[in-house]
Amino acid sequence: MAKDVFSVAIFFIVLRETLEASIIVSVLMSFISQTLMDKDGNVTDPKLKRKFMLQVWIGSFTALFICLAIGGGFIGAFYALDKDIWSGSEEIWEGVFSLIAVVLITVMGFAMLRVSHLQEKWRKKLMKSIANRKAKGISNWGKKYSMFLLPFFTVLREGLEVVVFVGGVGLETPATAFPLPVICGLIVGCLIGYFIYRGGNVMNLQWFLIASTCILYLISAGLMSKATFYFEMNKWNHQTGGDAGELGDGPGSYPFKSAVWHVNYGNPEMNSNGGYMIFNAILGWNNTGTYGSILSYIIYWLFVAFIMFLMWYKERRAARLLIAKLGDKVVDLEAASSHTPVQSSSSEDEFKINSPTDDKGDKAIDIVTEVRESSSPVEEHKDDKTVDVINEIRESH
């Protein structure tokens, strides 16, 4: 029979976890390719690109090896001791790994949105993180191996879930129904990630960054909600004495005291709900909404929106201040070139420059960020390029 050869439940379990991991890894690889690419589509530093791609692959395969070892140990203990030692801590594992992924994805998303303005600067930062081999401390280590950490924790979390969930399903599934759905799930998930990677390489950089960041934040917001729900379910399972979420959709399968709403269908923990399992992996769907999971989802988006507004405001404000400070230098150069006296002014109002916008504003923001992140004084950045940008902005007003 077909069910003895191909288990649909195993296929969707593997596809769900592979899909989430492949999306994050493919977006990260596209980010590296786009950052180290010039306007003509040529790689500016092939050696640096290979090093960071290698970090991504090493992080992914290291996590895969670890999760196979840990997951295999849990499954081996289950069959040897006839006791599912994973079930007592499953939600804790998932919740902790989800929170780690949320932090890493959120930080990466904020960084990616600035790449279009600071592509060359990001290339230099990536180069420094590799070159600074003598740097010590956790912070420097994290920067140096940043492209290793995100795929490592992502693949570790997803891979561990695959091994344990597939092992759990295997209790009621013939051994012959394992290989084909696992292979097919891995292939389909990896193919989707590959197409995202290829699409990210041919897309316009700005559109790619916006689209990929939106996808990452959708996944991250779902992970935030799921992490909260995992901790709530861990408490509920200890109160009920079992894994209540996998017993069905009715009363007793969810913490009803903290539930805001619940529907008796679409439970992503049920292996027969393949489509809802995919929604759970990408968007964080759950058929039960608790106060904690809903509030954490909303608070996460409010936090992201606040940080983005703060970044936008600080860049615009810094641009205005820098333009005002460079005003005297621009005026002096204009006076020298035209041999006509020009009244100098250093105040922002007298200089009559509003907040930069559009392309000229982007150029000013590049300079502002370079000055702000540099340890040298502002006066050292008054080069011809800066003066040209200031002149363009003045002429537009």
Curated annotation (Swiss-Prot):
Disulfide bonds: none annotated. The chain crosses the membrane at residues 61-81, 92-112, 177-197, 292-312. Its main location: membrane. The keyword Zinc does not apply. One of its GO terms (biological process) is iron ion transmembrane transport. The keyword Nucleotide-binding does not apply. InterPro entries: FTR1/Fip1/EfeU. Residues 337-346 have a biased composition (Polar residues). The modification Phosphoserine is found at residues 337-338, 346-347, 355, 374-376. Keywords: Ion transport, Iron, Iron transport, Membrane, Phosphoprotein, Transmembrane, Transmembrane helix, Transport. It comes from the Eukaryota. One of its GO terms (cellular component) is Golgi apparatus. Pfam families: FTR1. It is found in: Membrane. Residues 337-364 are annotated as: Disordered. Residues 349-364 have a biased composition (Basic and acidic residues). The modification Phosphothreonine is found at residues 340, 357. Permease for high affinity iron uptake. Belongs to the oxidase-dependent Fe transporter (OFeT) (TC 9.A.10.1) family. This is Plasma membrane iron permease. It comes from Schizosaccharomyces pombe (strain 972 / ATCC 24843). The gene is fip1.
